[in-house]
């Protein structure tokens, strides 16, 4: 009970910071818009790790879940064991959730099971580039290693904190470095979109820290500048990726 309460308090603190920072909310709004562009318009969407519930502003028919209780979510569930029927959702979305998973292979199997044929999963996750690797290693508590077997099944760790423990290098290893292995393990799934995101706007918001170095009024304009620069600088310093996976019809 104490562990569950601690995790709930951590999530509440994170959500409270988010709700106070308009600049950060504007960045996340742009993330949800990017995911929405690549999702199916029909059927229901499931969000894994919904936290503040702000996805409802972009997705109207959406069911929100998180690993600990939140007043903003519809249910509590473990992403490794999703409590839904087969082929139940047309879309699955998540932001900064995948790299916290202890066994991402199990999650992808579950996601494939509950997606309809033609269903899509859109994830926004950390991306390891020459510059971002420095930032993640020195300014984040999580590991940042891509020299791993991302498909390895790990024994359950009761001491693991699902909100804080993770590996920022996991998504890069899983979807980029081991892309061919991914498609062999999941022949029913196909990566249909990979896009580099985020250069400087998100760091200037301070993320979930209690400071912000930019006025919220500038965020949308600077995001446009960032989108212009990404084709030039993305391979060198992009901080995030958008990966869209489709279940074959």
Where are these regions (language model features)?
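A short beta-strand submotif of the Rossmann-like class I SAM-dependent methyltransferase core
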Residues: 91-97, 123
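A short acidic, Gly/Pro-enriched loop at the edge of an enzyme's catalytic core
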Residues: 80-92
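Short alpha-helix
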Residues: 169-194
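C-terminal helical/coil "lid" or tail adjacent to the Rossmann-like core of SAM-dependent
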Residues: 197-227
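A short glycine-rich, Lys/Arg-flanked "PGG" loop and its adjoining helix->strand segment in the class I
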Residues: 105-120
